[in-house]
């Protein structure tokens, strides 16, 4: 499983990271993946809602905007994309 994480400001990628695990993607562990990604990018972890998981499952990507974060975020959005091999 690979997830491409991008921090975007004004439509431009400011920072990116590819999160890799040998295990299969399981949606019950999605918050763990999100926490690991945010720790690696040195940003706060956003609030994860059911709609975020549904969007990731249906469209293979999810976008977290500044209102999804409790703490302030220096970027416009965190965009996670499932890399399908």
PLM-predicted stretches and their roles:
Residues 33-85:
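Acidic, low-complexity intrinsically disordered segments
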Residues 1-18:
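Short, extreme N-terminal segment that most often corresponds to the first beta-strand
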């Amino acid at each position: 499983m690979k997830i491409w994480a991008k921090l975007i400001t004004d439509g431009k990628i400011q920072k990116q990271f590819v999160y890799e695990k040998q295990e299969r993607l399981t949606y019950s562990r999605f918050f763990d993946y999100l926490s690991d990604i945010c720790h690696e990018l040195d940003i706060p972890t956003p609030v994860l809602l059911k709609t975020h998981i549904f969007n990731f499952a249906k469209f293979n990507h999810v976008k977290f905007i500044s209102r999804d974060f409790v703490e302030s975020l220096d970027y416009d959005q965190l965009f996670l994309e499932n890399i399908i091999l």
